[in-house]
């Protein structure tokens, strides 16, 4: 990934909005799906090229993308678990809780859902693959991302 820090955005007809990525020190710090990009967002970045290809149907799990997860440890653990859900598959919030070290699915359902909703980098931390809980991406975006992946 490019080491260029900044905000990058490109419009997606499939999502009917922009995909906006913020990068610092070679790591993704945020991903959002605004209807209008930040005024200083630039349209050219290798990650945006990959996202466009992905949205066009080219499989990409984005496993090599480094994401800066600056969240409390328990939320970070949940999001790190979500990163292990493979391209083209889905999981439930209960399954994510079961797979996350230190989480008890019967007691921590709320914690898992809060972590998913606080995801700073949807797509690269694929909360859209958790089919019964909302991530931080708009619901319509999550549905379209699952459709792209055939799940």
Short names for language-model regions:
Residues 1-63, 131-151:
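Low-complexity, small/basic-enriched stretches
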